[in-house]
Amino acid sequence: MRHFYSILTLLLVGLLSAQNNEPEIDFDSPDSLYREDQFYIGLSYSNMQNAPSGFDQLKISPNVFFGFLRDMPINKSRTWAIGAGLGYRISVMNHNLGIPENGNSDSYTILQSAFDKNRLTVHYAELPIEIRWRASTPESHRFWRIYTGLKLSYLVYNHYSFDGSGLTIKQKGNPDLDKLQYGAYLSAGWNTWNAYIYYGLNPIFKSATIEGKEIKMNTFNIGLMFYIL
């Protein structure tokens, strides 16, 4: 038993000595393996391109988008990185393009008479991937950044509403909309404020026509992007 207590005493002394020799961890020191800008939220305005003759946007056509991007640095100083993730976008388009109630792709028209509302709302799930440059350091979250990439968007919901001339139309699930959208974007700025532009590379409609001509409108969005963490 005496040998047991002797061994136990030696073990305790050794353990206490090892603990005293352990280096202290400074939780306030900068993290050299940091990641940046993994959550984002943005607000932009749609300016439709390649619109049919007579098309006009009414009021403001806003976009709200948000999501998560995994930041994957590719150099030692972590100023270059690849970002990839998942997002969601809601776009509201106020315009004078009349969308047929029965989904007939040949019945689209430019509205001539007065109306109170003519609005198309679309929701997209988005997969962005981008290359990132930033003048960041472990000590500061205030820096210049330039991010550019491609975004793949999948239509998950759409709703069209018209109100005017004693007529009200509400329609969901328009089959003429192209479910798959893709485009290029750029985000650049300092600290909190970042300019954002997006250019759609394919039309939002896949089979709609006006007077026998295909509607090849695509989106050009300009706005602001904010990054968190």
Regions found by a protein language model. Name each.
Residues M1-E24, L224-L229:
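Bacterial Sec-dependent N-terminal signal peptides
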Residues I25-D37, P73-W80, S136-W144:
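Short loop/turn motifs that connect adjacent beta-strands in outer-membrane beta-barrel proteins
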Residues S29, Y34, G173-L229:
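Predominantly the C-terminal beta-signal and adjacent terminal strand-loop region
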Residues L43-Q49, L86-N94, W133-A135, L150-N158, ...:
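Transmembrane beta-strands of outer-membrane beta-barrel pores
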Residues S46-G67, G173-D176, F205-S207:
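Surface-exposed strand-loop-strand hairpins of Gram-negative outer-membrane beta-barrel proteins
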Residues A51, K117-T137, W144:
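Outer-membrane beta-barrel transmembrane strands
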Residues P52-K59, M93-G103, Y108-V122, L155-G183:
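Extracellular/periplasm-exposed beta-strand and loop segments of Gram-negative cell-envelope proteins
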Residues F66-M72, L86-Y88, L127-W133, T148-L152, ...:
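Residues on the lipid-exposed face of transmembrane beta-strands in outer-membrane beta-barrel proteins
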